[in-house]
UniProtKB/Swiss-Prot annotation:
UniProt lineage: Bacteria, Pseudomonadati, Pseudomonadota, Gammaproteobacteria, Enterobacterales
Gene that this sequence comes from: yoaE
Periplasmic side of membrane: 35-48, 100-124, 171-184, 228-354
Main location: membrane
Keywords for the protein's UniProt record, in alphabetical order: CBS domain, Cell inner membrane, Cell membrane, Membrane, Repeat, Transmembrane, Transmembrane helix
Protein name: UPF0053 inner membrane protein YoaE
Membrane topology, record value: Multi-pass membrane protein
Transmembrane segment boundaries: 14-34, 49-69, 79-99, 125-145, 150-170, 185-205, 207-227, 355-375
UniProt-recorded Gene Ontology molecular function terms: flavin adenine dinucleotide binding
Length: 518
């Protein structure tokens, strides 16, 4: 027991424990990679069994100290190379590491055996355990030989190995979880395995590669990977601040081969969607899906029929005037008002109004039996759907905070917001192709314009819902006829406008430089 009082013994023990743990970290990473080939229920068992068998093997190697020392004696010579037992172990161990690392890299780069898709094939339990033992033997051989040269007491060496292995057993599961959550770390560690395997093969042929070179390369790579993980964490934190709806829409549109949403970026660790075959999804399908996914983020002002385009019946007019208005209009439903649009009495079908006129019934009395459903302009389109269901085929009047009518919304307006425009008989399309540009009404929904012209993120302010609002915001005031306003890639020329609003514009889209070269 006197040797236990020797400080050099404890210093040697501590040094060996640290050495075994440091040299065992890369071993643990590769054990985690091998265990991932097994079904989830067997991974912990394989990891513990493999490390336990490796511990027994290390203790056995330490017990053969005298024999291991003789491994440096040459056994035979081939050409100018002399091979000892240690050289052969290094050579074949290095070849095994090179083969294993190359195979793993190929499988991961080809995306094999790592997807949770249909029919994932798992490796045999004992095959993986055997590979873990062999891998540990290759990694531990150099450390064991180093330990023999550092300490003269076999019990001290065995104690260091047991302590280090206990630490490895405790750290194996958290490290495995970390490796599985970070695919780039796996590829980095496999590249380390290639370097270590190459150094072992070189040493087997008698070419000594200073360990400092390997440790410097590994350390530098680890620092770069740490920066990569920090950047990825910051990226995920930034993405988490974006609306879940925007991220979901981006993923679905990318899956269908459409353009991604503005401000939504991609994580390099996440695979890009598979190429979409030509014609797999029609442009109309992409348009409608985009409309559905972005419906909740849009304003009622971009969906509704604006105040200036509402056809309404003035109850104060004569019978003949009302009849003429009803017969000349393609609409089947009218708001009945008293003198002005803001004085709404009710919503009545044209057929009922014509019958009332023939029978001499007061139009206002008929309208008062069907009061209008009024919603604020701040209501989002998703909640509007419930209001339209309760309206039972009627439309909904949209007002501002002062009760002034801003427009009306019908079920058809919601459908147009999703599937595109369905103009009435008395309407012209909101967007018309005109040579190398487009004629666009001022009240056109900004989202519809972006879809039709294949542009994104024209307005920074979410309150801007129409083309007129866009040009007024960009210009700072209501522009005059002939003014040209540039918004992103669009050159907008004012065609019709007055002191209060913009009615018609002509838009020319600037083509990207690479398109012009083509």
């Amino acid at each position: 027991m006197e040797f236990l009082m020797d400080p050099s013994i404890w210093a040697g023990l501590l040094t060996l424990v640290v050495l075994e743990i440091v040299l065992g970290i890369d071993n643990l990473v590769f054990i985690a990679i091998l265990a991932d080939k097994l079904p989830p229920k067997q991974r912990d068992k394989a990891r513990l069994l493999g490390l336990s068998l490796a511990l027994i093997m290390r203790l056995g190697l330490l017990s053969l100290i005298s024999w291991m020392v003789t491994l440096t004696k040459p056994l035979f010579t081939v050409m100018d190379f002399s091979f000892s037992g240690r050289d052969l172990i290094m050579l074949f161990g290095g070849i095994f590491l090179l083969f294993k690392a190359t195979t793993e890299l190929h499988e991961r780069l080809e995306n094999r055996d790592h997807d949770s898709g249909h029919g994932k094939g798992y490796a045999s339990f004992w095959v993986v355990v055997t590979q873990i033992v062999i891998l540990d033997a290759v990694f531990s051989l150099d450390a064991v030989i180093t330990a023999v040269g550092m300490v003269n007491h076999l019990p001290v060496m065995m104690a260091a190995v047991v302590i280090a292995m206990a630490v490895m057993l405790l750290a194996s599961k958290p490290l495995t979880r970390f490796v599985n959550q970070h695919p780039t770390v796996v590829v980095l560690c496999l590249s380390f395995l290639l370097m270590i395997g190459l150094s072992l093969v070189a040493e087997g042929f008698g070419f000594h590669i200073p360990k400092g070179y390997l440790y410097a390369a590994i350390g530098f790579s680890i620092i770069i990977e740490v920066f990569n993980q920090i950047a990825r964490r910051n990226f995920i934190r930034h993405q988490s601040t974006l609306p879940l709806r925007a991220r979901t829409a981006d993923a679905i549109l990318r899956l269908m081969g459409g353009k991604r949403q503005a401000n939504v970026q991609h994580d390099a660790d996440n695979p890009m969607p598979m190429p979409i075959p030509e014609g797999a999804f029609a442009e109309e399908e992409r348009y409608m899906i985009n409309g559905v996914l972005t419906l909740a983020s849009r304003s009622l002002r971009g969906i509704m029929t604006p105040r200036g385009e509402i056809s309404w019946v003035d109850a104060n007019l004569g019978v003949d005037e009302i009849r003429e208005q009803l017969l000349s209009s393609p609409h089947s439903l009218f708001p009945v008002c008293r003198g002005e649009l803001d004085e709404i009495i009710g919503i009545v079908r044209a057929k009922e109004l014509l019958v009332a006129l023939e029978e001499g019934v007061d139009v206002a009395a008929i309208a008062s039996a069907s009061p209008a459903i009024i919603v604020p302009e701040t209501l989002d389109p998703i909640n509007l759907l419930g209001v339209l269901r309760r309206a039972r085929g009627s439309f909904v009047i949209v007002t501002n905070e002062f009760g002034v009518v801003q427009g009306l919304v019908t079920p058809l307006d919601v459908l147009e917001a999703i599937a595109g425009e369905f103009p009435d008989a008395d309407e012209t399309p909101e967007i018309i192709t005109d040579g190398d540009g487009w004629l666009v009404k001022g009240g056109t929904d900004l989202h519809a314009l972006q879809q039709a012209l294949d542009v994104e993120h024209l307005a920074d302010d979410d309150d801007i819902a129409t083309v007129a609002g866009l040009v007024i915001s960009a210009n700072g005031h209501i522009p005059r006829v002939g003014d040209v306003i540039d918004v992103g890639p669009l050159h907008i020329t004012i065609i019709e406008a007055n002191d209060y609003r913009v009615d018609l514009v002509r838009i020319v889209k600037e083509q990207p430089a690479h398109d012009e070269d083509e």
